[in-house]
């Protein structure tokens, strides 16, 4: 188990409360059952999570949010770790990225329309930023937005979009004559095409969202028209930190029960854990896991404080964690032997989650290329 030495009592309470809630409401048996649920999660369950603060930690107090420690991103990263440890469902990342953006940049009118229900868990938001075959960069957006009188017309395709088929609101990034802009679009908008995608994760749903001349009023613009590049960078940094925290939480749990398995399982009359070759391998794995946790905490602090190198540190974290965590879980599968590749064992649930996280919002190679 990874030990956090710098948590405040309030943060420890948030972590422990989240852990107990997840263990009680979505044990792995329930996660398997939710694989048959079209949404991948229960709306009533998500509202109960919102009551614990999951949706409001990145939102300013004047708009109904607030954190337990005045370090909202660190608090939310703790929640993400616990959700990774239980392979939990729910739109944690997407809804929080959108809620944070609306809190910071939306007009009072727009925020009052969407934020209250997002914070209460009654509605869900999707972050429509990724485009098929393209990197997430300000100059890499192919989707277009052009004026038509007092309105804007959106044309293009976004995908894969997390909770795209379940969202009530879409935060859409598009390029127009003014530059990069963002729009808040209701899922009920005409000419919106939602195509569910088959995913590896059993409970995390993605979709491709087609905007075939979707008309939105000028009041749907979030922030400054043509000035969304800094907002996009801030959103990506937040998303990468939460992804890394979730991957670390999942890998930590898998490592723990793999070590226990090595003590319980015998081979040639000896516990697996007694073999020196496996001891050395476990030591290497523990080093990589602690390193993944350390770079995630460092990235969280950098993004939380708005450090000048926050974007660089967040990308370094995703590159390292996104590479190491899937490898670590694959090693754990090997150490379990044949039982590790069965449907009945829980290992594949965790491997599915970290592989999806690795590929979403830029894989390690893409982030290394960006850093270079």
What are these regions (language model features)?
Residues 70-71, 137-139, 163-167:
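Short glycine/proline-enriched turns and hinge-like loops at secondary-structure junctions
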Residues 121-132:
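A short, Trp-centered hydrophobic/proline-enriched beta-strand micro-motif
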Residues 136, 140-142, 160-161, 186-223:
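Flexible, small-/acidic-enriched active-site or ligand-binding loops
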Residues 1-86, 105-110, 117, 121, ...:
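Alpha-helical interface subdomain recognition
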Residues 155-193:
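A short core secondary-structure module
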Residues 88-109:
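N-terminal glycine-rich flavin-associated loop
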Residues 137-155:
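Cytochrome P450 C-terminal beta-domain/meander region
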Residues 103-106, 146, 172-175, 184-187, ...:
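Short beta-strand-to-turn element immediately C-terminal to the catalytic PLP-Schiff-base lysine
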């Amino acid at each position: 188990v990874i030990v956090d030495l710098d948590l405040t009592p309030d943060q420890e309470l948030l972590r422990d409360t989240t852990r107990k809630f997840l263990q009680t409401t979505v044990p792995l048996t329930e996660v398997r059952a939710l694989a048959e649920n079209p949404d991948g999660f229960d709306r009533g369950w998500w509202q109960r999570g919102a009551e614990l603060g999951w949706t409001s930690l990145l939102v300013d107090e004047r708009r109904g949010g607030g954190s337990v420690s005045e370090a909202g991103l660190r608090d939310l990263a703790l929640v993400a770790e616990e959700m990774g440890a239980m392979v939990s469902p729910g739109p944690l990342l997407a809804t929080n990225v959108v809620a944070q953006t609306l809190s910071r940049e939306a007009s009072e009118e727009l925020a009052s329309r969407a934020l209250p229900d997002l914070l209460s868990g009654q509605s869900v938001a999707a972050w429509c930023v990724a485009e098929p075959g393209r990197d997430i960069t300000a100059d890499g957006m192919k989707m277009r937005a052009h004026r038509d009188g007092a309105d804007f017309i959106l044309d293009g395709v976004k995908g894969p979009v997390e909770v795209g088929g379940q969202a009530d609101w879409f935060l859409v990034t598009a390029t127009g004559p003014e530059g990069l802009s963002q729009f808040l679009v209701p899922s009920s908008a005409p000419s919106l095409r939602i195509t569910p995608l088959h995913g590896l994760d059993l409970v995390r749903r993605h979709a491709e969202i087609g905007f075939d001349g979707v008309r939105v009023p000028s009041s749907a613009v979030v922030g400054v028209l043509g000035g969304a590049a800094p907002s996009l960078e801030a959103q990506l940094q937040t998303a990468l930190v939460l992804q890394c925290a979730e991957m670390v939480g999942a890998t930590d749990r898998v490592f723990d029960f793999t070590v226990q398995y090595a003590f319980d399982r015998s081979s040639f009359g000896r516990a697996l854990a007694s073999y020196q070759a496996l001891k050395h391998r476990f030591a290497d794995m523990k080093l990589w896991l602690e390193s993944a946790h350390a770079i995630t905490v460092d990235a969280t602090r950098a993004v939380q404080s708005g450090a000048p190198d926050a974007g660089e540190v967040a990308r370094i974290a995703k590159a390292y964690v996104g590479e190491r965590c899937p490898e670590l879980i694959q090693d754990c599968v090997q150490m379990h032997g044949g039982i590790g590749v069965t449907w009945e064992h829980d290992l594949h649930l965790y491997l599915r989650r970290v592989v999806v996280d690795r590929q979403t919002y830029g894989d390690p190679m893409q982030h290394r290329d960006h850093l270079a």
